[in-house]
Amino acid sequence: MVKPKIGIFGLTGCAGEQIVILNCEDQLIDILDAIDIRYFPTAMTKNDDKCELDIAFVEGAVVQPEDEELLKKIRQRSKLLIAIGTCAVWGGLPAMRNDVQREEFLEKVYGTKGKSFKSIPAQPLNNFIKVDLSISGCPIEKEQFLKAVTYLLHGDPPLLPSYAVCTECKMNEYVCMLVGKNKLCLGPITMAGCGARCPGYNIPCIGCRGPVDEANVASEVKILKEKGFTLRDIENRLRSFAAQAEILQEQFKKE
């Protein structure tokens, strides 16, 4: 039986998703019996950067012209391309202030030396190529990566959460951070899958997994305003991880 060829790539980011994959440890060893990893520079010294791939996992945002060039090459050689991590899916932290001219950032940080930088506003992968599946998270949950690989090996799309973090809070019987503790919590509009980890430690959800489908952002903002949070604080929180999401962009235009 021919093993599916897999590639694991990183664009501009922290490599958090690749570390999560390595931390799968025992489970990863079991998976290696069923797949042929041909490209994974974080874990391997010998990598094939030309072979055709059955599945490519790509983390990181497109922040440089070289990122875009590499991404398009990966797409051309891959049957399936999976975006992993919030940077790849939404643009992540690097894209939080794309509304500000990049030249202004570069000048403030690097002075005149910033003029030589070739970086571009950070963008998610699907702004450049077709993405077959997105697994969000900062970083991703290793269980979701393992599930995705297992399902894809059987030719099926993995079943990922399609509900909000609030649902996981209720399942865990946590006190609501928004209503019960009056915290600036984005749980009602954030994609689940983390097990409501932050609320479990008495920390409000900061939206690191990006917005859930059909999130009612306007109602979330209205509730937060009524609780005394300033529009600036609310917008800064919303921009932190998924500022490029269309549903959030629509809200920013209203304010």
List each language-model region with its residue ranges.
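Portal/gating segments that form or line small-molecule/metal binding sites
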Residues: 97
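Short gly/pro/ser/thr-enriched loop/turn and capping motifs at secondary-structure boundaries
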Residues: 87-92
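Iron-sulfur (Fe-S) cluster-binding modules
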Residues: 1-57, 62, 66-80, 103-255
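Short beta-strand elements at the ligand-binding edges of bilobed clamshell
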Residues: 100
